[in-house]
Curated annotation (Swiss-Prot):
One of its GO terms (molecular function) is ion channel inhibitor activity. Keywords: Disulfide bond, Knottin, Secreted, Signal, Toxin. Disulfide bonds join C49-C62, C56-C67, C61-C77. One of its GO terms (cellular component) is extracellular region. Expressed by the venom duct. InterPro entries: Conotoxin (IPR004214). This is Conotoxin 1. Belongs to the conotoxin O1 superfamily. Residues 1-22 form the signal peptide. It is found in: Secreted. It comes from the Eukaryota. Residues 23-46 form a propeptide. The presence of a 'disulfide through disulfide knot' structurally defines this protein as a knottin. It comes from Conus vexillum.
């Protein structure tokens, strides 16, 4: 009888802790996804223009920079 009560209490405790942990994890994952989306928007590779020193053969330079031709035929964004 005592063993049965201990097992029932243990199962209830573990179930409750699983439910609490699952609810907490769901909120954290949602926040992480939002943060990851913000990081992707500001990622250098996702920009539509070339930064200073980057090549300008396939995409235009960012505002305030112009494409300067290099000795090897390729250009780079310069102020």
């Amino acid at each position: 009888m005592k063993l049965t009560c201990v097992l029932i209490i243990t199962v209830l405790f573990l179930t409750a802790s699983q439910l609490i942990t699952a609810d907490y994890s769901r909120d954290q994952r949602q926040y992480r996804a939002v943060r990851l989306g913000d990081e992707m928007r500001t990622f250098k590779g996702a920009r539509d223009c070339g930064e200073q020193g980057q090549g300008c053969y396939t995409r235009p330079c960012c505002p305030g920079l112009h494409c300067a031709a290099g000795a090897t035929g390729g250009g780079s964004c310069q102020p």
